[in-house]
């Protein structure tokens, strides 16, 4: 506060520097109102009082011995501890201003400017080595304890005496002593045993000169006692204790001998301290186990010496309580419970608090505590925490030579060792944990019971447990075999199991495969799971922020899963490649026979398998699907015995033809084209290599089975369509939708009626032909993205993709909802489709068994995803989607069970869908509602070109026949994302919109016509300019909605959301064009259908969305979105899993990060694009509304506008996929 030579108070006339407006100016004291407070300690009893200076005789100087006037008026000797000048001074400045100030605002003239020791000689220029040193001396400590400095200095002016005292005190430190004191009545001399401790133990107790700090064995309290009153105790010289002191004295002797801590120096840790500490440690363990951070270390550190920790805390808490600073709340640091024991050991290892000078060391201590460093103050915070809680205890332990002898001797002495041990243990534990994880994953591979992906694990556990037996058998067989063999064997085993167990075995086999792949995935994932962060995942700016956030979460999960899938998809790719050669080369006779057998048996279990696959695709677990299968079968039988029998006959018929086709295909496997020819159903899925004619032939061959029961099938097909819609929605593969729809429509048309088939076929041929190349390129791209995005597991990778997506499954909750809805839809669809699905699935499964997944992916990429459920159905799904919407609306109101019964829209659906599309197309003709016509009008282009986006719909529909394959990756992504997230988010919006569509379909075929028109893009219907306009609108909507392939999910959701928000009319410009009445009808229908639709929605959120939006515009939109999804595959951020396979984990990470950076950059550019796109979309919508009446005859302008809109959409998707750079440029 003041320099030592400053007077205790200032006198009038003193020249000072006084603070005036923040600056010190020369002034002179004019008047002084003196008030000097003096803190003194009486020498006779060491009591401290504060008095005014007028009660003191003697020099007012710290450390001076003076006489102080007592309350009774007597003077007693005392030592001045502290002087405080509380006087008020009125000063006059040179200009005459007066101001009244406290002493703190004054300083003696010049003192502030030239400290005593500073002279001009030491200025930097003349004293270079002092360069940089401030001329003014360092400020004295201005803290609360600043007064101790002068006090100590002055009192230690007689340094010799003080040094002697200190030496004596140091000698006494840690000694057991007896402290003499006089009772309050001064009649009796008393004593108590105590332990001399370091004065630094307590800031609260001021230890005066000649005093020492002791801790009493009697009550554990800390007191400052005069040095002269302390006598060392030895067993010989100890005074005789009385009864009161007996226990304390014994404890003191015990401590003297063996350093045994007295019981009253410990505290029973209170519930909130000890148990809370234990709990907190458990919490820490939980938190840190999750992170596998230091908590495991802490626990490991603590567990070897639990009693030590307890002993330490008992003593610490008691120590803090006795010195007057109890720890009432659990110490917290960095939002974590602070492990004081660990902190104490860490600091001890570093030599104690006083030896740690660097903040970096403290920061390391902070990190060693396992607390995440949240800011730059971490080191300071831990230092303060240590000083607050442990520094006094450290000094106490040091001075008392307390090594926590109960168990802490090791702890304190061996703290470093313990730390090292603990650290080693931690490292070992962490490595062990990793090894264990790997082993567990391996064991999971071996024992499908354990689902490798953590996400899958929970879902799979349900399925796995029942399937353990069969899986174990499978797995036991598998380990010795090569991966190819494993896959082949697993497929065979799965087929056999499905034959044997129908319901459960297939699921088990699939799970076994999935577990293997998952295990590999997990291992692969383990390296990269965490590096993809939400902030790194680029998403288009969306108006629906909350949903976007939700999607972001889901998307992040999906992306992670994608990475995982990619990580293990390399394996899948490898497996596919490995199996590819055998597959392409003629499959082994065993495989063929097995496949044929499986097909034959699968004809029975085909629907089950399809259900399983569908359920898997939809996110249903195999076990659930198997259970559902039986239920669905029962329901089917109960609900539709006739149709089911018909279906069965159909299924049997198709199954036989399929098995024949399969065998043929196996023989002809070398060429995909041959395969396509041989296997119409598969061809539909594989359509990549098929020519339109072949597709037609295949479709016709397939439809021939259904022709005889066209009417029943139409009904069933509608149901199937519902299911397909659901499945499609689940398989939101955008491209596949369009293509599938096209295929479905053509197939449906063909199967619907020969004449219609022929017509459709004719229209189909040009489209297919035009699009086959597109679809092929799309397929290639999609295959790449598929490899990327979805690990294809046994069943076309669909099951696994879905599983992985499911696993990724944004949330098991979503998957469950989706599963439930899927179950309902699947059951109804499965009934009709079971037969065909059986046939196709049998064929499919046999094909899967024979062909490498990669080949299947290439052939069926789109179909694969969809074909995985049912190769042919993939196409029908789209057409079916719309119709199934109708049917769903109808059937949902009629019988959700029917939907439930409908297994997969798989191959069965394609036929019904084909028929339905005919109907739908007819309705479409009635309704100009869908922009698909304009899309149809637009010349087919490769889906990748912007116009091809428009056409992509067409080509998608066509190439969905030809190339349903490419879509799967994105679709699956979208599907899984949507099926689960969307199922939740979109379920509402989609439900509404599907219901709208359904209600439209029910109330007016217009809604379906719109969807159908988009779905049956085969029929270029320039008839309705409105359709063209709506197509454009849809394209725009699609742009807005499905603006991103990655974000397709998001875009779909956005579309649904937008539809909801816009009133279903806004997004679906067609809806607007159609009429408010239709919207009303939709709303009503929605109300009636909501449950069923929700099921559909959850099942196929993406698809439903597209129906919702695309029901009128939606279908087109989905197609466009799907193309958008396809397109992303080509972009610079797309890559092949096979490439990733060959990389090291570090390379993979760096590459993925590079891709993310590119995507981010693209995203930022797209972000601005989106705004302009939105504006354009609004303008286009306006124009479309205006020109809807005028341009009804001109479909080409609308198609061109649609193309533009598609380009915009692509640009928007490029936002999401960032893969549409060219598209976005075009849009710009």
Curated annotation (Swiss-Prot):
Residues 306-398 form the ARID domain. Signal peptide: none annotated. The modification Phosphothreonine is found at residues 706, 942, 1066. Residues 437-464, 483-511, 556-569, 596-606, 635-667, 691-700, 721-730, 755-765, 825-843, 911-926, 972-981, 1112-1124 have a biased composition (Basic and acidic residues). The keyword Zinc does not apply. Residues 277-305, 701-713 have a biased composition (Acidic residues). The modification Phosphoserine is found at residues 276, 295-296, 482, 579, 581, 588, 630, 691, 703, 930, 945, 1068-1069, 1071, 1075. Residues 744-753, 927-937 have a biased composition (Polar residues). CDD domains: ARID_ARID4B, Tudor_ARID4B_rpt1, Tudor_ARID4B_rpt2. GO terms for molecular function: DNA binding; transcription cis-regulatory region binding. Residues 944-965, 1003-1017, 1188-1204 have a biased composition (Low complexity). Acts as a transcriptional repressor. May function in the assembly and/or enzymatic activity of the Sin3A corepressor complex or in mediating interactions between the complex and other regulatory complexes. Plays a role in the regulation of epigenetic modifications at the PWS/AS imprinting center near the SNRPN promoter, where it might function as part of a complex with RB1 and ARID4A. Involved in spermatogenesis, together with ARID4A, where it functions as a transcriptional coactivator for AR (androgen receptor) and enhances expression of genes required for sperm maturation. Component of a Sin3A corepressor complex consisting of SIN3A, SAP130, SUDS3/SAP45, SAP180, HDAC1 and HDAC2. Interacts with ARID4A. Interacts with AR. The C-terminus mediates interaction with mSin3A corepressor complex. The N-terminus is involved in transcriptional repression by HDAC-independent mechanisms. PANTHER family: AT-RICH INTERACTIVE DOMAIN-CONTAINING PROTEIN 4B, RBP-RELATED. This is AT-rich interactive domain-containing protein 4B.
């Amino acid at each position: 506060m003041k320099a030592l030579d400053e007077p205790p108070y200032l006198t009038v006339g003193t020249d000072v520097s006084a603070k005036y407006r923040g600056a010190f100016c020369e002034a002179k004291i004019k008047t002084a109102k003196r008030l000097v407070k003096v803190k003194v300690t009486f020498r006779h009893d060491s009591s401290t009082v504060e008095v005014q200076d007028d009660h003191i005789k003697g020099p007012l100087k710290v450390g001076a011995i003076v006489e102080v006037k007592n309350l009774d008026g007597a003077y007693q000797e005392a030592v001045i501890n502290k002087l405080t000048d509380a006087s008020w001074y009125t000063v006059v400045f040179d200009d005459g201003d007066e101001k009244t100030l406290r002493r703190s605002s004054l300083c003696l003239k010049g003192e502030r400017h030239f400290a005593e020791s500073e002279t001009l000689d030491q200025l930097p220029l003349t004293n270079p080595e002092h360069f940089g040193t401030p001329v003014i001396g360092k400020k004295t400590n201005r803290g609360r304890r600043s007064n101790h400095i002068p006090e100590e200095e002055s009192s230690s002016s007689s340094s010799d005496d003080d040094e002697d005292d200190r030496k004596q005190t140091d000698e006494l430190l840690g000694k057991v002593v007896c402290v003499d004191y006089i009772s309050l009545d001064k009649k009796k001399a008393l004593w108590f045993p105590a332990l001399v401790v370091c004065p630094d133990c307590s800031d609260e107790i001021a230890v005066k000169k000649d005093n020492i700090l002791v801790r009493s064995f009697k009550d554990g309290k800390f007191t400052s006692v005069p040095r002269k009153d302390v006598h060392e105790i030895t067993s010989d010289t100890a005074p005789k204790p009385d009864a009161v002191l007996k226990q304390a004295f014994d404890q003191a002797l015990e401590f003297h001998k063996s350093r045994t801590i007295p019981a009253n120096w410990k505290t029973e840790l209170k519930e909130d301290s000890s148990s809370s500490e234990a709990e907190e440690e458990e919490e820490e363990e939980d938190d840190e186990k999750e992170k596998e951070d230091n908590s495991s270390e802490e626990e490991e550190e603590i567990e070897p010496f639990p009693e030590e920790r307890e002993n330490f805390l008992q003593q610490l808490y008691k120590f803090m309580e006795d010195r007057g600073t109890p720890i009432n709340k659990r110490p917290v640091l960095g939002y974590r419970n602070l492990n004081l024991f660990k902190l104490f050991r860490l600091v001890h290892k570093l030599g104690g608090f006083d030896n740690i000078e660097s903040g970096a060391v403290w920061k390391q201590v902070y990190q060693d505590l396992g607390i995440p460093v949240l800011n730059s103050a971490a080191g300071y915070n831990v230092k303060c925490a240590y000083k607050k809680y442990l520094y006094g205890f450290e000094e106490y332990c040091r001075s008392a030579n307390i090594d926590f002898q109960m168990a802490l001797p090791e702890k304190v002495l061996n703290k470093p060792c313990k730390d090292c041990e603990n650290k080693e243990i931690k490292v070992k534990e962490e490595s062990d944990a990793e090894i264990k994880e790997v082993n567990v994953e391996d064991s999971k591979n071996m024992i499908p019971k354990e689902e490798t992906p953590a996400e899958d694990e929970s879902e799979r556990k349900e399925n796995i447990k029942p399937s353990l037996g069969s899986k174990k058998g499978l797995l036991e067989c598998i380990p010795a075999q090569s991966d190819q063999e494993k896959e082949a064997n697993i497929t065979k085993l799965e087929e056999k199991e499905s034959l044997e167990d129908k319901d459960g075995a297939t699921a088990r086999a699939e799970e076994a495969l999935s577990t293997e792949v998952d295990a590999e995935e997990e291992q692969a994932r383990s390296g990269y799971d965490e590096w993809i962060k939400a902030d790194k995942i680029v998403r288009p700016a969306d108006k629906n922020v909350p949903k976007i956030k939700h999607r972001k979460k889901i998307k992040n999960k999906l992306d992670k899963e994608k990475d995982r899938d990619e990580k293990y998809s390399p394996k899948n790719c490898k497996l596919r490649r490995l199996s590819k050669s055998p597959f392409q080369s003629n499959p082994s006779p065993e495989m063929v026979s097995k496949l044929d057998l499986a097909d034959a048996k699968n004809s029975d279990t085909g629907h089950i398998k399809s259900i399983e696959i569908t359920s898997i695709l939809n996110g249903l677990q195999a076990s659930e699907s198997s259970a559902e299968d039986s239920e669905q079968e029962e329901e089917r039988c109960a609900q539709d015995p006739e149709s089911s029998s018909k279906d069965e006959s159909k299924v049997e018929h198709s199954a036989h033809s399929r098995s024949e086709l399969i065998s043929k295909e196996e023989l002809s496997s070398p060429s995909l084209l041959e395969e396509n020819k041989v296997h119409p159903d598969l061809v539909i899925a594989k359509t990549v290599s098929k020519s339109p004619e072949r597709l037609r032939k295949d479709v016709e061959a397939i439809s021939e089975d259904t022709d005889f029961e066209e009417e029943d099938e139409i009904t069933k097909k509608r149901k199937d369509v519902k299911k397909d819609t659901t499945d499609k929605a689940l398989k939101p593969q955008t491209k596949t939708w369009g293509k599938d729809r096209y295929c479905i429509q053509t197939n449906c048309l063909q199967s619907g009626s020969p004449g219609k088939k022929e017509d459709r076929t004719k229209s189909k041929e040009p489209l297919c032909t035009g699009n086959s190349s597109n679809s092929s390129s799309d397929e290639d791209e999609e295959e790449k993205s598929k490899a990327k995005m979805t690990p294809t597991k046994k069943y076309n990778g669909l099951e696994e993709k879905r599983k992985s997506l499911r696993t990724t499954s944004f949330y098991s909750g979503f998957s469950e909802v989706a599963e439930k809805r899927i179950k309902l839809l699947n059951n109804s669809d499965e009934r009709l489709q079971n037969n065909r699905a059986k046939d196709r699935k049998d064929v499919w499964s046999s094909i899967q068994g024979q062909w490498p997944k990669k080949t299947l992916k290439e052939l069926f990429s789109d179909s694969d995803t969809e074909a995985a459920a049912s190769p042919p159905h993939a196409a029908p799904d789209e057409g079916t989607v719309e119709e199934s919407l109708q049917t769903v609306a109808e059937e949902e109101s009629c019988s959700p069970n029917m939907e439930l019964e409908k297994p997969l829209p798989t191959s069965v659906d394609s036929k019904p869908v084909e028929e339905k599309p005919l109907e739908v197309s007819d309705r479409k003709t009635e309704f100009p509602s869908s922009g698909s016509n304009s899309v149809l009008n637009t010349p087919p282009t490769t889906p990748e070109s912007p116009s091809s986006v428009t056409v992509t719909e067409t080509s998608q529909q066509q190439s969905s026949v030809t190339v349903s394959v490419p879509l799967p990756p994105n679709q699956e992504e979208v599907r899984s994302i949507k099926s689960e997230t969307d199922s939740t988010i979109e379920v509402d919006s989609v439900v509404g919109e599907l219901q709208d569509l359904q209600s439209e379909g029910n109330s007016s075929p217009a809604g379906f016509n719109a969807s159908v028109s988009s779905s049956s893009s085969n029929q270029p219907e320039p008839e309705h300019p409105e359709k063209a306009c709506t197509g454009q609108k849809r394209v725009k909507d699609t742009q807005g909605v499905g603006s991103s392939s990655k974000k397709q999910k998001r875009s779909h959701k956005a579309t649904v959301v937008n539809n909801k928000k816009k009133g279903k009319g806004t997004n679906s410009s067609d809806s607007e064009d159609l009429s408010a009445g239709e919207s009303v009808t939709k709303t009503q229908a929605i109300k009636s259908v909501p449950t069923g639709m929700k099921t559909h929605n959850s099942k196929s959120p993406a698809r439903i969305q597209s129906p919702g939006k695309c029901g009128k515009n939606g279908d087109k939109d989905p197609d466009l979105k799907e193309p958008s999804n396809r397109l992303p595959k080509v972009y610079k951020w797309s890559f092949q899993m096979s490439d990733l396979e060959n990389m090291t984990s570090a390379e993979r990470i760096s590459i993925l990060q590079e891709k993310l950076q590119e995507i981010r950059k693209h995203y930022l550019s797209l972000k601005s694009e989106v705004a302009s796109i939105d504006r354009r979309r609004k303008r286009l919508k306006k124009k479309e509304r205006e020109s809807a009446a005028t341009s009804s005859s001109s479909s080409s302008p609308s198609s061109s506008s649609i193309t533009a809109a598609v380009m915009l959409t692509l640009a928007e998707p490029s936002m999401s996929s960032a893969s549409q750079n060219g598209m976005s440029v075009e849009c710009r």
